C-alpha cells in the first residue's frame, strides 16, 4: 500500500466498499508487507461486512470515535510536549486483523519466549550458570542498571519471577513475524487495548461478530486468579496496582485497568511496610496488601535499598519480598531483560535452557561490546538501528533509537566514533521495515497505509515452568507510525489501533463478573478509602466550593461596576476589600469608594475602571493561588488523583470547565484590551459548569468515608468564606446601610441583593419573605435558618454531623466525645 484509496461520497446506488478497495488499492510494496493485499488477508471479509457503507459514513464513525475518546477522558501524556503534554489518545478507525493461522504462530512463539525469560531471570538471580558458561556477557547483567544486586538470591513467593511480559513484533516483507523488543519491568498497554476494543467493536459490531473475533475478558480474569494463587492468601488475596501518579504518561490506563479488574489503585505513599508485610493506609486503619502489580520502574520501588530520593516507592518493600509476604508483578530486577543487546543471545540461551530453537525469530541484534560483533556490523551502520544498550541509564547516557539510513554521512561518521570509543553502551539492530495496514484518513483522502508494530502480552496462567504456564492475550496493541516516521512510538506522535484475532473455534464469551453462589456474596462491603484519596477528596470539596465562591464574588463586582444604579460607598468598600482579601485583585489599588476627599471623589470613575481591569486581568493568573482559574486548575488536579473514584461524566465536566474558562479568559483579556462583557460570559459559563460538578459530587458518589471528607471540605470552605464576608459587612456598616436603602430588591447593587447573591440565597429570600426589606429576616436567613444550606447555622450543623460520623467510625461510640 503505497498510495491512498479515495472515493467520492456515496449515493443510494453506492458500490460495496470492498469493490472500491479492490479497484483502487495499489500494488503491494516490495519494502513492506501489505496487510491489506497479503496472502489470506482477512481484510476482504472485513470490508465485505461493511457492505455498501460509503466513505462519508466512515467519516461520521471517525468523528464519533474521536468524540468517545474525549468523552471517556482517554489521554496519553507526551513528555516532549511541554505546552500540551496531555493529549487525547489517538485511535484509528480500522483494527489490525490477524488470521487464526497467523495468531497460532505468534502464540506458540510468545509462550516459549516468556518461559525462556523466566528461566533466564531465575538463573541470573540464582546460580548465574549462564554467565559461567559464557552464554551471557557479565557486563550485560552486572553492568545493567536494571540488575538489582539486592535481589540476588531472593526466591519470590510462589517461585515465579515474571507474571507478565510484553513483546513488540514486526512483520517482515515475506510476511513472517519477528520480535523487535521485549518489556518486563512495567509493560504498558493492557488498559489502552481494552479501551480500544470497547470503542472499535461498537463501530463495527456486525463485522466483529461475523468474523469470530476472540474476546479478552477470560484471559484477564485468569491472570488475576493466577496472581492470587501465588499468594498464601489465595483467592482472598488483596491485589493493588501501584502507579507513579497522575503525571505518568500512561496514568489513564492505570486507573482504567484498576477499575476494570477490580483492583485497588495506590501510590507509593499509600503503602507502608510493617513487620515485613505491606499494608495500605486507609481511613479505617491499615489493610494488608498481598499482591502488587507495579507500574513504577524498579529503581524507584524502595528508597531504603535502591534510589534513596525516590518518592514513588515504599520503604522496606524489598525486605517484604524477601520474606515472601507479598507477590510483586513482576519481581523487581527484570529490567535488564529489556536490553536490546540480549536479543542476540536468546537463540543460544533457548538451546541451553529449553533444548529448542526459537519458534518466533527475533530481529538480528549485535551488542557492540563484543569485538567480533562490532567489527562485522559497524561498517553496515547505514542499514542498522542504533539503540542504547542500557536504556534510561543516567550513568551510561540514553537516547531514542536512531535509524542509520536517516543520518548524513557526517552524522554516521560521528556515531561510528562514539560507538568505537564506548562500544558497550550501544547495540545495533537490523532495520526491519514494518508491515503496512490500511487506516482511515477522511472521505477525501480515503484509506492510506501506515506502518504498524504489534505489542502482544504473555500473562501467567499458573505456577511452574514451561509454555503451558503462560497464556497470550488474544489481541494486542497496534502502534502506528506518525507521518513520515519509521519507528512506531506514541511519544513520537504515533497512533494506535485495535487488534482483532480470529478463531475457528467457538468464541469464549466469558466476562469478569464473578459467579455468586450464595446470597451472602451480595452483603454490603465497605469500599476502602486510602488516606491519600481521603485527602484529595477533602481538597476536591474545598476547591469546588472555593471556585464557586470566587465566581460569585467576581460576578457581584462586575454587576456593581456596570449597573445603571450606582452602588453605595459602603457596598463599594465591602466589595473591594473582599476582592483584595481573597486575592482577586492586588493590594494597593486606589479606593473605589469615597473617602471624603474631594480629589478622590472626582476621579472615582477612573479608579473603578482600574479596579475592573485588575479583576479581568486576574481571572486566570497562573501563579496567583487565589485566582478563579488557579482554583479551577487545583480542582482538576485534585480530581486527577481520584480518577478511579469519579465517573467519566464528572471528570469530563471538570476538564471541560477548566479548558473553557481558560479559553474565555483569553478572549476577555488581550494585550491592551479588557472586555467586561466577555469576562462576565466566562464567569456565567463557569458558574453553570460548577453547578453541574457540584451535582455530580452530590448525587453520583457513594456516601462512604471519602464522600464524608469531600463534604467536610466543602462545608469548611463555605463556613469560612461566608462568615468572613458577614464579619466584614458588619465592620463596614453594610447592615446599617441596608436599613436606609430604598432600592428595589431586583437591583443587584443594593446591599440586600448583594448579600443574598453572595450567599446564593436570593430565590429563597424572595420565597420566604416577599417584598420584605427588614434586616431581621435577612440575618435569620443568612445566619440562623435551619433549612437554608447557605446559612451559617445549617453549614455548622452539617459540618458537625459529618465530623461526628467519622469520629464514631474511628474513635468513640459517643458523638459527644467527638464534638
Annotate each PLM feature.
Residues 2-35, 163-164, 171-178, 182-354:
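ATP-binding N-terminal substructure of ATP-dependent carboxylate-amine bond-forming enzymes
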Residues 34-42:
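N-terminal amphipathic, basic-rich helices that act as targeting or association modules
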Residues 42-59:
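Short, surface-exposed, low-complexity cationic segments
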Residues 62, 68-161, 172-174, 184-239, ...:
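Alpha-helical transmembrane segments and their helix-helix packing motifs
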Residues 103-127, 145-148, 253, 258, ...:
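Active-site nucleotide/adenylate-binding loops and adjacent lid/helix of ATP-dependent enzymes
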Residues 162-165, 382, 424, 452-454, ...:
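Short beta-strand or tight-loop elements
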Residues 380-383, 394-409, 413, 418, ...:
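Polyanion-binding catalytic cores of nucleic-acid enzymes and NTP/SAM-utilizing transferases
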